[in-house]
């Protein structure tokens, strides 16, 4: 619907609605990244991508969405999940300039949701992902975080995601 305070998501969804198209990076690193780190349902995300894009063919879209975007195949197609925080989006686009959230903030109600959802995704999927050498450094960084920060990440993520479904 594009009814979100997150400028990057809003713009990508509006462009998709208008053109039935989005650049690969918009699909992978904004829409797909959000679906991945927010823990959205694989079947529903696959269906959405197939419905909204004029160039979506099942033989291409399903492996790309399930394997590359959502890492739902456990790493057969992609060697690591394409997950990132707000800093990546800020470096690769100009969406953050006009966003209601602050990409520089890591927690709290004004923080970019990509920032805390990224760490929450890693925490939720630790058993599956920690042994992946391509992201093991991120788990070392997570381990060095204080317990208060980890609790704030979990709290912000829980409340943000709850608001989506309410």
Segments predicted by a language model, with ranges:
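C-terminal catalytic domain of photolyase/cryptochrome flavoproteins
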Residues: 1-166
